[in-house]
A protein has these predicted regions:
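Membrane-interface helix-loop junctions in multi-pass transport and translocation proteins
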Residues: 39, 69, 76-111, 118-123, ...
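Membrane-embedded alpha-helical segments of multi-pass transporters/permeases
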Residues: 16-24, 29, 41-44, 83, ...
Length: 183
């Protein structure tokens, strides 16, 4: 489980970091300025998407261990968390708050779910965090052009260059990962 988790972390981390760092810019450059808010939504949803991607393939462990009741409890917790988030966002009349609460609540549930899977599989938590940390470092290096861009004034040309460099670095990282997987 820890090995699969690490591979999934290496796959999911770069796009998550790109969205978390530059979601509004990606959406506004790609679709126009009126889509900027969708990029803000994507920023809030990035951690949740990451955790779903690295956790969902491991969820078959519930069936293997015949712990379907635990999966039902997880789904109930997830449903309750999401309902509370949406109701609170509606009560406050703030769409962004609703999306943020929904996403952060879902991410928290999936994090607990991931910790349960790691524990149930007999793996040490440190093994999975080590893999996540490695993925974070490599992804941080891959998206470093976007990080550098935040230190300079906004300019659409610079954003384009940063996105291009980031795309090349992420693609290079994926090629290295695929080469290792096929050896």
């Amino acid at each position: 489980v820890a090995d699969i988790h690490e591979k999934l972390a290496h796959i999911a981390m770069p796009p998550t970091m790109v969205l978390a760092l530059a979601g509004p810019e990606i959406f506004s450059i790609t679709f126009g300025q009126e889509w900027r808010q969708a990029g803000l939504f994507a920023q809030w949803m990035a951690p949740w998407g990451y955790l779903v991607l690295v956790t969902s393939p491991l969820s078959t462990l519930f069936s293997v261990l015949e712990k379907q009741f635990h999966e039902m409890l997880f789904q109930g917790l997830l449903l309750g968390t999401r309902l509370v988030a949406l109701l609170l966002g509606a009560y406050l009349g703030d769409v962004m708050m609703a999306v943020a609460l929904f996403s952060l609540g879902s991410a928290a549930c999936y994090l607990v779910f991931l910790l349960w899977i790691i524990r149930a599989s007999g793996n040490a938590w440190s093994a999975s965090w080590t893999g996540t940390a490695r993925a974070l470092v490599w992804s941080g290096l891959s998206v470093s052009p976007l990080l550098v861009l935040y230190a300079s004034p906004e300019d659409s040309f610079r954003w384009s260059v940063a996105f291009g460099l980031t795309g090349l670095m992420v693609a290079s990282r994926y090629l290295i990962l695929m080469k290792r997987a096929w050896q």
